[in-house]
Amino acid sequence: MIDHLKRTKIIATCGPALTKSLVSLKMLDDNEYAAIKKVAYANIEAIIKSGVSVIRLNFSHGTHEEQQVRIKIVRDVAKAMNIPVSIMLDTNGPEIRIVETKKEGLKITKDSEVIINTMSKMIASDNQFAVSDASGKYNMVNDVNIGQKILVDDGKLTLVVTRVDKQHNQVICVAKNDHTVFTKKRLNLPNAQYSIPFLSEKDLKDIDFGLSQGIDYIAASFVNTVADIKQLRDYLKLKNASGVKIIAKIESNHALNNIDKIIKASDGIMVARGDLGLEIPYYQVPYWQRYMIKACRFFNKRSITATQMLDSLEKNIQPTRAEVTDVYFAVDRGNDATMLSGETASGLYPLNAVAVMQKIDKQSETFFDYQYNVNYYLKNSTANKSRFWHNVVLPLTKKTVPKRKLVNSAFKYDFIVYPTNNINRIYALSNARLAAAVIILTNNKRVYTGHGVDYGIFCYLIDKNPNQLTKAELIELAWKAINHYQAYGDLEKLKQCLAVYNETIINL
């Protein structure tokens, strides 16, 4: 039996599979939708109970009111459960999509000529279709060259450019395979320098809306340079929202060329393997995933692995063995969080997908090489320069190392309780990959919901400034928090617990 609180975080994308047909706030108060509302609330409660700590909202789809409904449901449920849940806004970003096709789509045959209209709103027909970005102002003819590949619908259709007609705003291509394309399907231009602005008008409106709703994270699509991060940070500062964390989505070869700088400039990265696998050879993706996770550990940043982790669970109950291995080794490599996209947004079995991911994450934590973690990562991480690291984090890491890495019962401690509002110290505790869950006592609501991505961190809201607690108050609150998370994690029997008071480790 695996009896410990899962420390790897799960990010679940919220969509109709979870919140059903609820698309307006009025529907929540309408008795006609009472049954649907009950199911939606039950779904969110179930996935939080199964270990979801971040709800991702994909702003490539849905209206603001639809997303507001989802935020309200999540906040209502999280408050009732007394469990912090972070909200992540995923930007639309600079992407190109097919404008419109007929219901049956547009069938493209191998070796046929395909004409892409770059400044038109035409409905696709006769081997022609139109493309646009979110603003409707982007002209793709400026970003392509003869001989270049264009990938459509996640690479399911490959086109090669044979001619660029700037006068008529057309890109003429030859199809390399058969495929049927549909409305809103994405286009990728591998290795192209896109002339689309990093933050479109739509992105800024979405971000403004998200800030009004108190989001915790922005997953910024198609980050290519440090300048992209700076542009977004400056905008957040202008909006008095510097506390919102930026997760850079790595989706292009240009981003990989700047990867260390991007990691250092952001609060964390998302290995967005879908688009990345189209922009670079797919067989290079595992290497870069490992590199980015390792670099995030080194720079004390958060890492998320995303895209098709349990893709088959959109339609099936059982995951493929390859998917199980994928999730397992993402955690084993040192990921902070594993993410579900279509599995929970539009899949048939969203609750099952979360439950499956929870089991795999916990299993990987059980066999994680904690001794290697001490010997290597703690010596190489940039976080080891701080006094707190040497006085608290390193001793805790050594103290909690299991005696035998392959035996779950060798976990000696269940919880470590630390009172703080210091984000950098929370990051240090998370990055250490302690063999116990860390409960942060905080009176800051931004801190309370702001660490849903951080490995091993569980926040507990208190009334008093955590830095002003007496030792007796700390011990009393520590046990309240421990009992709360013991119940949340369905832990039958507590092992030993620790607390940190004035940088001194004490047994509870």
Swiss-Prot record:
One of its GO terms (molecular function) is potassium ion binding. Substrate binds at residues 56, 274-275, 307. It catalyses: pyruvate + ATP = phosphoenolpyruvate + ADP + H(+). Pathway: Carbohydrate degradation; glycolysis; pyruvate from D-glyceraldehyde 3-phosphate: step 5/5. Its cofactor is Mg(2+); K(+). ATP binds at residues 58-61, 97, 185. InterPro entries: Pyr_Knase, Pyrv/PenolPyrv_kinase-like_dom, Pyrv_kinase-like_dom_sf, Pyrv_Knase-like_insert_dom_sf, Pyrv_Knase_AS, Pyrv_Knase_brl, Pyrv_Knase_C_sf, Pyrv_Knase_insert_dom_sf. The keyword Transferase applies. Keywords: Allosteric enzyme, ATP-binding, Glycolysis, Kinase, Magnesium, Metal-binding, Nucleotide-binding, Potassium, Pyruvate, Transferase. GO terms for biological process: glycolytic process. Pfam families: PK. K(+) binds at residues 58, 60, 90-91. Regulated by phosphoenolpyruvate substrate and is allosterically activated by ribose-5-phosphate, AMP and other nucleoside monophosphates but not by fructose-1,6-bisphosphate. The record marks 249 as: Transition state stabilizer. The keyword Transferase applies. Signal peptide: none annotated. SUPFAM superfamilies: Phosphoenolpyruvate/pyruvate domain, PK beta-barrel domain-like, PK C-terminal domain-like. Its EC number is 2.7.1.40. One of its GO terms (cellular component) is cytoplasm. Belongs to the pyruvate kinase family. Homotetramer. This is Pyruvate kinase.
